Each structure stands twice: as structure tokens, then as C-alpha cells.
């Protein structure tokens, strides 16, 4: 999901427009001990079985949500509150940002995970860095919630690919996927995060990027990057699933102008399942069209013999009336194994969590419609 920073209630991060450097980035290793969470006694690693997901030994259809912001919270009680509410509501999967890239280190105590500056990549493992994600993983383990952890954003929110290009060079997003220096910095970060949580059963999947695309590129650019990067991750960690995080065909439905080929990506052995997003308002289509979008992706996944994750979907009004149709379409489509609405909202110690217009909050009528009732429908269908 692309969203405006002006809509975020969390403190925005300062990004400096540093001049590009042609040098190969130098990865600065962490000197802070990494308190890697211990796997929960009752949990097991998520896997797939044909076109289904298997969570803690249970094969079926699973509901979940997105809360990109949870790793940036500095109050542990807020993190626990979110997972308490999710678990009691029957939500099983939460997708979070495992990235927070800056070109200038914040001086106000804001959380950031990686600094790209002067051709160097420095991973922040301090209390305002990956230790915040550590607690998210720890709390997820405690509450039985599975996490999808994403490594970089296509969009500029929380740094994104442009934060890399400002530090290491590159003129457009195509350069990001093919520039050796950029990819060295990216892979160093991926390796650090994967190794940090490699033994955690709370991790559902590693995700390459949020909505990666390459406007005007041949599909081979993205495909080759997906193939190379997913193989790199599998070489580090064979225990966890790997997915792309693509919105599928970009902002222009059923076209390849964004350099994405959904069906072709499903053929990559080191990609375990498909992901796709749905925002008709942003794409100039009507809400009813969304059901076709869902069933077409389900068919592609079924043909490939891999599960589909309906990973993001949202509207800014009439949540229940519109999104309920999409949930039902996904639940009844052969090939879809889970759905994650965008996005989860809750009342934290500092006030409401971020609202980008698509958010609906725990305890609201919309939450009852799209979470409580949806979970009940899933449970009935499993009997």
C-alpha cells in the first residue's frame, strides 16, 4: 500500500537528499548483541500443503491483517495490546514492515532500522532500532500470531528504494534491481534480519519487498531479481516460507506496464506462494470488479499448485458492504488460502494507531463485520 506521510500519526522520519555515490556500499556490522527471540514451545514453522497454508499443524484458510507501524512503537504494552486483541479476535497472520530506511539518523529518538549514508549501510540494532522488531517477534510468539516481515518498500514511505539510490547511485527504479552496490546493501540487510529471527516460529514468511515494480521495464528485470533474491534467502534459511509482496501487475490491472508477471513469478521454485493486492479506487475500477481480480489470481495460483495470499485490500468508506464481498469471494475461490485486510487499527497509549483512510479499529462495527463475522464464517466452513 502506498500512503501519504501526512496521514501518519507516528513521527515522520527525516530523509536527506544526499548526492549519489558510485562506490560499493560498505556494510557496518552490528556491535550490539542480538536478543534473538526463542521459538514458542507450542508453535511450529508455517508451511504449505498444495494450495493451502499450514499453521501450527492446522491446514486451512486463515484471516489476518496489516499493521506496518507496529515495529516502530516504543511502548511494549502497546505491542502486547495489539496482539492480545488480534489473538482474541481470531486473526492469525499480521504483515509488518521489517524495514525503516533513512539517509540521516534521526535525533529525536524516532525508530529507524538502517542508515544509508556516504556509501555505507549501517544497521541499527539499538533500542530505537531492530530491538523494537525483536519485541514484536517476541510478543507474536507469546500470542500465537504469525508474521510476514518485509525487507524494503518500493514507495518512499519509511525510506524505500530511493533511500538506497540516494546513497549508492542510480537514476531510476530499474537501477535499484540491477545495481550491484544497491543489491549488496539490500542483501546484507536481508541476511542480518533473517539470521536474527531464523529460529522463530512466529515468522510466517520473509517478503522481498512491498509492491516491487519497474515501470516500463521488461518483465525479465523483476523476474530475475525475484529469482535471485528468493534463492539467496532460501540459502540462508530453509525453515521459513518466502514470498514477493507484489501488488500484482502494479496499479494498472491486467497489464505489464509495471514490469510484473504474476503467473510467471509463481513458477519460481524458491517462491512458496503468490501475493496480490486490491484497491479499485486507486485503479479507476469499480468495487464489484474486485471479485474478478480475486478469482483470476486464485485460478493462477491453483494452476501453479501454490497458495495465494490476498495480502492487501481496502476502501476508504463503506468498509463492511464492499470488503465483505471480497472476503466471501476469496474464501470461496479455489487457490486463495488467506486474506489480510489493510489495515488493523487500535487505540494505543498515545491515541489511535495510524489511519490512512482504509483503517478500521478494534471494537468498531466495521471490525465486527469484517473480522468477528469473517472469522466465524471461516470456522463454519472448516467443519
Swiss-Prot record:
Substrate binds at residues 97, 210-213, 279, 283, 342. Glycans are attached at residues 75, 199, 332. It catalyses: Random hydrolysis of (1->4)-beta-D-mannosidic linkages in mannans, galactomannans and glucomannans. Optimum pH is 5.5. The active site is at residues 211, 312. Optimum temperature is 52 degrees Celsius. Residues 1-18 form the signal peptide. It comes from the Eukaryota. Its EC number is 3.2.1.78. GO terms for molecular function: mannan endo-1,4-beta-mannosidase activity. Disulfide bonds join 214-217, 301-308, 320-369. It is found in: Secreted. GO terms for cellular component: extracellular region. GO terms for biological process: mannan catabolic process. Keywords: Carbohydrate metabolism, Disulfide bond, Glycoprotein, Glycosidase, Hydrolase, Secreted, Signal. The keyword Disulfide bond applies. Its main location: secreted. Monomer. Belongs to the glycosyl hydrolase 5 (cellulase A) family. Endo-1,4-mannanase that catalyzes the random hydrolysis of (1->4)-beta-D-mannosidic linkages in mannans and heteromannans. It is a crucial enzyme for depolymerization of seed galactomannans and wood galactoglucomannans. Active against locust bean gum and gum guar. Also has transglycosylation activity. This is Mannan endo-1,4-beta-mannosidase A. It comes from Emericella nidulans (strain FGSC A4 / ATCC 38163 / CBS 112.46 / NRRL 194 / M139). The lineage of its organism: Eukaryota, Fungi, Dikarya, Ascomycota, Pezizomycotina. The gene is manA.
Amino acid at each position: 500500500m502506498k500512503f501519504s506521510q501526512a496521514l501518519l500519526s507516528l513521527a515522520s522520519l527525516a530523509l536527506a537528499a544526499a548526492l549519489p555515490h558510485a562506490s560499493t556500499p560498505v556494510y557496518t556490522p552490528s556491535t550490539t548483541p542480538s536478543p534473538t527471540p526463542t521459538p514458542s514451545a507450542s508453535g511450529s514453522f508455517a508451511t504449505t500443503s498444495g494450495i493451502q497454508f499450514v499453521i501450527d499443524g492446522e491446514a486451512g484458510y486463515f484471516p489476518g491483517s496489516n499493521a506496518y507501524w507496529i515495529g516502530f512503537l516504543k511502548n511494549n504494552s502497546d505491542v502486547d495490546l495489539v496482539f492480545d486483541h488480534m489473538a482474541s479476535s481470531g486473526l492469525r497472520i499480521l504483515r509488518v514492515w521489517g524495514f525503516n530506511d533513512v539517509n540521516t539518523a534521526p535525533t529525536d529518538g524516532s525508530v529507524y532500522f538502517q542508515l544509508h549514508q556516504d556509501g555505507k549501510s549501517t544497521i541499527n540494532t539499538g533500542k530505537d532500532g531492530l530491538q523494537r522488531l525483536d519485541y514484536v517477534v517476541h510478543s507474536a510468539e507469546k500470542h500465537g500470531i504469525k508474521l510476514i516481515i518485509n525487507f524494503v518498500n518500493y514507495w518512499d514511505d519509511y525510506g524505500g528504494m530511493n533511500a538506497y539510490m540516494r546513497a549508492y547511485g542510480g537514476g531510476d527504479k530499474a537501477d535499484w534491481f540491477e545495481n550491484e552496490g544497491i543489491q549488496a546493501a539490500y542483501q546484507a540487510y536481508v541476511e542480518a534480519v533473517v539470521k536474527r529471527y531464523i529460529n522463530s516460529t512466529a515468522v510466517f514468511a520473509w517478503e522481498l519487498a512491498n509492491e516491487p515494480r519497474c515501470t516500463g521495464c521488461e518483465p525479465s528485470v523483476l523476474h530475475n531479481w525475484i529469482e535471485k533474491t528468493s534463492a539467496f534467502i532460501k540459502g540462508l534459511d530453509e525453515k521459513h516460507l518466502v514470498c514477493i509482496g507484489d501488488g500484482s501487475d502494479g496499479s494498472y490491472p491486467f497489464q505489464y506496464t509495471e514490469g510484473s508477471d504474476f503467473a510467471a513469478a509463481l513458477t519460481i521454485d524458491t517462491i512458496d506462494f503468490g501475493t496480490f493486492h486490491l484497491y479499485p479506487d486507486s485503479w479507476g475500477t469499480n468495487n464489484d470488479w474486485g471479485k474478478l481480480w480475486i478469482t483470476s489470481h486464485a485460478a493462477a495460483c491453483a494452476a501453479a499448485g501454490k497458495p495465494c495470499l490476498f495480502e492487501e485490500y481496502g476502501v476508504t468508506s463503506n468498509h463492511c458492504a464492499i470488503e465483505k464481498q471480497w472476503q466471501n469471494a476469496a474464501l470461496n475461490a479455489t487457490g486463495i488460502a488467506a486474506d489480510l485486510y489493510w489495515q488493523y487499527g487500535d487505540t494505543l497509549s498515545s491515541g489511535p494507531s495510524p489511519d490512512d483512510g482504509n483503517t478500521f479499529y478494534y471494537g468498531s462495527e466495521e471490525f465486527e463485520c469484517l473480522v468477528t463475522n469473517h472469522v466465524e464464517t471461516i470456522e463454519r466452513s472448516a467443519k
